[in-house]
Amino acid sequence: MMEDPLIPWLTEHGLVCHPHTLSGTPISLGSAFQLAGLKLAWRVEIEQRRVWIVLIQRVEQRRGLKNPFAALYMLANAARAVLGPDYYLYGNVDVLAGSSLSTQRLAHFYRRWTGAKELSTGWFSLKVSQVITLSNMKKRQNNGFA
């Protein structure tokens, strides 16, 4: 697997990145970092112009998340800065273990509030140039723009 082009940018912004493998085997699935109570693993696919989100997982048991979108926002910023605005975040929507939120409700959120496109059941794509902060998302919601 090629060197991940996002790692230098993420490292410059204070994150520690490491390889992410399949269940502890030597099979590489991409790279990962931890931020705001979550572990996020991804793989850049240059040919498809996408950043495939391989895993989002709580690193602490049900203590609440500071901002559940902070890791995704950081990844989108890295992709936009390094790869350009025409890349996409891509991944399968599933709720975090132990969450009371349903997969359907989370999928609705991604479609309605983020503008993500559901390419096939549960698989979403969102242009990195469209990713906004949670604060801005709430402002849009409160002003009726979502």
UniProtKB/Swiss-Prot annotation:
InterPro entries, sorted: LcrR/CesD2, T3SS_LcrR
Assigned keywords, A-Z: Calcium, Plasmid
A Pfam family this chain is assigned to: LcrR
Keyword DNA-binding: no
Residues spanning the signal sequence: none
Function: Involved in the down-regulation of lcrGVH transcription in the presence or absence of calcium and is necessary for lcrG protein expression in the absence of calcium. Plays an important role in the regulation of the low-calcium response.
Protein name: Low calcium response locus protein R
GN (gene name): lcrR
